[in-house]
Regions:
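Short, Lys/Arg-rich N-terminal segment immediately upstream of the first membrane anchor
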Residues: 1-5
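Alpha-helical transmembrane segments
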Residues: 6-13, 179, 188
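Active-site flanking residues adjacent to catalytic metal/cofactor-binding acidic residues
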Residues: 20, 82-83, 142
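Membrane/wall-proximal cationic-aromatic binding patches
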Residues: 27-105
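Interaction-surface signature
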Residues: 30-37, 120-202
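Conserved beta-strand elements of the Class I
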Residues: 77-81, 111, 138
Length: 202
């Protein structure tokens, strides 16, 4: 009888674990964050050819790591260059970022060439490497602090939570390691410690 109850208890725990894992993935996009790569020219950028959902919002990056559809040579192209304001992040749906709204309303394709904390020098370095994509015009939108934030090539990709280079194996691992632990025990203990190291591999 005791052994049977133990089996039932384990089965219930496994069911809860699996159900929560599926829910975190399907409804919240855990273990599905946009990934980044390092660049020797412009520090970092979102990896190319990504498409997914995160916290209910759609994100899409084309073959040039732009948060846009592929450049369309049949349309007038304008380059939108900037930092997190233009980038939008995962809390802004693909259709709601400024460049998507502009493209939808004008018929002009505005390519979104941006990343969090990018400054003018990041944008210039990207264009020097990738080209101008046949653009007729371009504009730069950066906040006051990013306008003077020169590239220093500090390692942030895979080091800082905002710039992951690989997915968590389990949504549970991301929930605990990236959100719950740093905001609770991590603050009390003054750092990531062993738990963060372990959950980053989960």
């Amino acid at each position: 009888m005791v052994r049977l109850k133990k089996k039932h208890f384990i089965a219930i725990l496994l069911t809860i674990f699996v159900a929560t894992e599926v829910s975190l993935r399907q409804f919240w996009g855990f273990a599905n964050a946009p990934l980044y790569y390092e660049s020797q020219s412009y520090e970092y950028m979102a990896r190319p050819n990504q498409d997914g959902y995160r916290f209910g919002n759609h994100y899409h990056y084309n073959a040039y790591s732009q948060r846009s559809e592929e450049p369309d040579s049949t349309k007038v192209i304008v380059l939108g260059l900037g930092d997190s304001v233009l980038f939008g992040g995962v809390m802004t749906d693909q259709d709601s970022i400024a460049t998507s709204l502009f493209s939808a309303e004008t018929g002009v394709q505005m390519l979104n060439i941006s990343a969090g904390s990018w400054g003018p020098d990041n944008c210039a370095a990207y264009l020097k490497e990738k080209g101008l994509f046949g653009a007729r015009a371009m504009f730069l939108l950066v906040s006051s602090h990013d306008a003077h934030d020169n590239m220093d090539f500090k390692e942030v990709v895979g080091k800082h939570a905002s710039y992951p280079d690989k997915q968590y194996l389990f949504a549970w691992g991301e929930l605990i390691g990236r959100y719950v632990y740093p905001r609770t025990l991590g603050r009390l203990l003054g750092g990531g410690g062993i738990l963060t190291t372990l959950t980053s591999r989960c």
